[in-house]
C-alpha cells in the first residue's frame, strides 16, 4: 500500500518513488 504522494507528506514510506525523483 504505497500512496503516490511521497513528497506530499508521507514520511512513513521510503522516498523511492516520486519523492526520490
Curated annotation (Swiss-Prot):
Please give the subunit comment from the record: Heterohexamer; disulfide linked. Contains 2 sets of 3 non-identical chains (alpha, beta and gamma). The 2 heterotrimers are in head to head conformation with the N-termini in a small central domain.
Q: Which organism is it from?
A: Bison bonasus
Residues that bear Sulfotyrosine: 6
Q: Alphabetically, which GO biological process terms does the record hold?
A: adaptive immune response; blood coagulation; innate immune response
A cellular component annotation (GO) from this entry: extracellular region
Stretches of Acidic residues bias are at 1-11
- Comment, domains: A long coiled coil structure formed by 3 polypeptide chains connects the central nodule to the C-terminal domains (distal nodules). The long C-terminal ends of the alpha chains fold back, contributing a fourth strand to the coiled coil structure.
Please indicate if the UniProt record lists Disulfide bond as a keyword: yes
Q: Where is this region: Disordered?
A: 1-21
Official protein name in the record: Fibrinogen beta chain
Q: What does this protein do?
A: Cleaved by the protease thrombin to yield monomers which, together with fibrinogen alpha (FGA) and fibrinogen gamma (FGG), polymerize to form an insoluble fibrin matrix. Fibrin has a major function in hemostasis as one of the primary components of blood clots. In addition, functions during the early stages of wound repair to stabilize the lesion and guide cell migration during re-epithelialization. Was originally thought to be essential for platelet aggregation, based on in vitro studies using anticoagulated blood.
Free-text description of this protein's post-translational modifications in UniProt: Conversion of fibrinogen to fibrin is triggered by thrombin, which cleaves fibrinopeptides A and B from alpha and beta chains, and thus exposes the N-terminal polymerization sites responsible for the formation of the soft clot.
Where does this one sit in the cell?
Answer: Secreted
Amino acid at each position: 500500500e504505497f500512496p503516490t504522494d511521497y513528497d506530499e507528506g508521507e514520511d512513513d514510506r521510503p522516498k523511492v518513488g516520486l519523492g526520490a525523483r
